[in-house]
Amino acid sequence: MLPPAIHFYLLPLACILMKSCLAFKNDATEILYSHVVKPVPAHPSSNSTLNQARNGGRHFSNTGLDRNTRVQVGCRELRSTKYISDGQCTSISPLKELVCAGECLPLPVLPNWIGGGYGTKYWSRRSSQEWRCVNDKTRTQRIQLQCQDGSTRTYKITVVTACKCKRYTRQHNESSHNFESMSPAKPVQHHRERKRASKSSKHSMS
């Protein structure tokens, strides 16, 4: 048995130890629960995020569908097969070439376009006559002709291999139609003739 005086000193020490133990337990629980992540309240997702998920993460802006944006235009190429003749001789094999006389349309409207659909209504609002299908690339090809007497002839001809669309303004269109009605230009008087005329006028005045 311990004397009462020692019990008097041990009691506060026991209380201090008890408080430290409780503090240690509290610290442990705080550390334990500090790693728990609080659930984030669910916010309604916007339409843009849904569109990005459906479209595979691609961003589509409204500027891509603007009516004022430039559209790439292409030719609907026409392919022809014909024989070449000079009146007496005719080509042995037919000649295949491109004829750049088709209609100029936006690339998404062309039949060989792989991309998605494009509104033809938008294109119909624009003046399709501003664009013309013209020759883009050509190459020289030799072709052999068979004559009626059995002889052969070889000619070099230019074959169109690619077409392109060229834009013409209204001035070009008007000039192409009205070039015949233009009045002939006045003959230009040279500087020497003017000097001679001025000298002759001076002599006549004197």
From Swiss-Prot:
The keyword Disulfide bond applies. Highly expressed in kidney and weakly in lung. The keyword Signal applies. GO terms for cellular component: extracellular space. Residues 188-206 have a biased composition (Basic residues). PROSITE patterns: CTCK_2. Disulfide bonds join C75-C133, C89-C147, C100-C163, C104-C165. Glycans are attached at N47, N173. Residues 75-170 form the CTCK domain. GO terms for biological process: canonical Wnt signaling pathway; epithelial cell fate commitment; hair follicle morphogenesis; mammary gland bud morphogenesis; negative regulation of BMP signaling pathway; negative regulation of canonical Wnt signaling pathway; negative regulation of cell fate commitment; negative regulation of determination of dorsal identity. Residues 174-206 are annotated as: Disordered. Residues 1-23 form the signal peptide. It is found in: Secreted. It comes from the Eukaryota. GO terms for molecular function: BMP binding; BMP receptor activity. Keywords: Disulfide bond, Glycoprotein, Secreted, Signal, Wnt signaling pathway. May be involved in the onset of endometrial receptivity for implantation/sensitization for the decidual cell reaction Enhances Wnt signaling and inhibits TGF-beta signaling. Directly antagonizes activity of BMP2, BMP4, BMP6 and BMP7 in a dose-dependent manner. Interacts with BMP2, BMP4, BMP6 and BMP7 with high affinity. Belongs to the sclerostin family. This is Sclerostin domain-containing protein 1.
